[in-house]
């Protein structure tokens, strides 16, 4: 085998391993949202602390609901950052209270998650449904296949994971 063929075979093997692994990013990342990384640890922590507040859904698991909420918060922040817009903690807290999410304030992890998610409501209030949905859907999101896939039209992680375990905790 010539050196050129060996290099070509090596490149193909590396590409196949990358594709077969199922993860374009680190397994410790839940998603890449624009220029922001959402960690699996942040999703794990939110699942552990906030699952008790989730109403069961026939379509999404509590983990997917919470992962979607965490990722939506990051998506909203990307849109706000792109515009140079700021949303203070006090404004976020008002949005949380106004939208019936104050029960989540009793747990610090859930409070942080819902405060981030308040950016979504702010954009809908500011821009109206159509424009906000278009802006949020336009943000590039790459979800870790262990969570499922990101549905930009509905702004949710859905479907089954590509791996046998939902995901592993990282230290």
Give the role of each language-model region.
Residues 1-61, 138-171:
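Short, low-structural-confidence N-terminal segments
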Residues 24-113:
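N-terminal targeting/tethering segments
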Residues 73, 77, 82, 109-171:
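A C-terminal, polar beta->alpha supersecondary segment
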